[in-house]
Swiss-Prot record:
GO CC, any one term: cytosol
One Pfam family matching this protein: DUF150_C
Disulfide bonds: none
Biological-process GO terms, alphabetical: ribosomal small subunit assembly; translation
Protein name: Ribosome maturation factor RimP
Organism: Syntrophobacter fumaroxidans (strain DSM 10017 / MPOB)
Localization of this protein: Cytoplasm
Keyword match Cytoplasm: yes
SUPFAM superfamilies linked to this entry: YhbC-like, C-terminal domain, YhbC-like, N-terminal domain
Gene3D superfamilies: Ribosome maturation factor RimP, C-terminal domain, RimP-like superfamily, N-terminal
Functional summary from the UniProt entry: Required for maturation of 30S ribosomal subunits.
Chief location of this protein within or outside the cell: cytoplasm
Length: 168
């Protein structure tokens, strides 16, 4: 395997592993009063890392992350989804958190976000601006005094830009 390969079996296998981990762990994490914000699975020095980002109303503590890590680790050991060595990390999504669900966008209306689209608007795929509105199927954001409506179905990824949202 070349070092640049995303995983044994390629990027599709990484996506499949992420989906399986999400499906396996979401009910248990939800039962703990938390939600999964994002799951990453990638090769880093010295090996593979599985990161599960969780959040709850009021934020998550180090103790919360340790508890969820034990639960997720036990589930993954039993399910045997990943067949080679990896390191599990459970943490808060941080200030510049990813945005995936409509509800997550609704919480940050008026803040600065970044969106990368799957299909370009003209020649543009990257947008950074103030989130103005969240609809059922799309968001509206102001990028340098120009309004863009971006459907959720065209979003590759989106992220809150916490420090860009703070006033001087």
């Amino acid at each position: 395997m070349k070092k640049s390969d995303p995983a044994p079996g390629g990027e599709e296998k990484v996506d499949r592993i992420v989906r399986q981990v999400w499906d396996l762990t979401e009910p248990v994490i939800r039962a703990e009063g938390m939600e999964i914000i994002e799951i990453e699975y990638r090769r880093e020095s010295p090996g593979w890392v599985l990161r599960v980002f969780v959040d709850q109303e009021g934020g998550v503590s180090v103790d919360d992350c340790a508890r969820i890590s034990r639960v997720v680790g036990d589930l993954l050991d039993v399910a045997d989804i990943i067949h080679y060595p990896y390191h599990l990390e459970v943490s808060s999504p941080g200030l510049n958190r990813p945005l995936r669900k409509r509800e997550q966008f609704a919480k940050v209306v008026g803040k600065v976000i970044e969106v990368k689209t799957l299909v370009p608007f003209g020649t543009r795929r990257n947008f950074k601006g103030i989130l103005k509105e969240v609809g059922v199927e799309r968001i509206r954001m102001d990028c340098d005094n120009q309004l863009f409506e971006i459907p959720f179905s065209n979003m590759d990824r989106a992220r809150l830009r916490y420090f860009d949202s703070q006033e001087d």
